[in-house]
């Protein structure tokens, strides 16, 4: 598997304060998750999503390479595998990846590996940061190679031979917030917890409402759902 050199553990801890954002992502994942499916959290981090999902979906496997994060996942009783290549071909019903693909230099190789491991008819969900003009020191701090557009993300997934079932943007207000962060950025790449909480509590719900109008052309994140042809 292509190496993932992750340097953003502190960012994961900070993002735990974004309750509405995390609830949104969890709901996003659960839309396609069924209790009897084999599910893979690709880049499970500290278990923010795999932990709650495992309470009702016992066939979930966490893919994680960072030793510290692996230990955190195992302490929650989660099944952890370091390399997706270790799983049998065509064994996965549903794979989701949240804010991970941007960390991988050869994203096309990873998408091809997903295709190999997902069963025919199986589904994937990919959630990534959007728009290169929003690239900040925070992206650099946590090891992002790029940000995506709907088009560029779709291209990577289609090249792996998946069929796209939906693609859209999320968090329209987050575009303005990120531009403000970029304008005030002093290069540290850190997240202000107080400002994050304020945004998550008051702005993110508004953003979700506006997203119904803007989802096809603007948003801080890009989302793709796809299926492996049967």
Give residue ranges: language-model regions:
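Helix-to-beta-strand junctions that scaffold the AdoMet/dcAdoMet cofactor pocket
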Residues: 34, 104-105, 118-120
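Conserved N-terminal segment of class I S-adenosyl-L-methionine
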Residues: 1-98, 108-113, 192, 197, ...
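A C-terminal cap/extension of S-adenosyl-L-methionine-dependent methyltransferases
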Residues: 5-7, 171-230
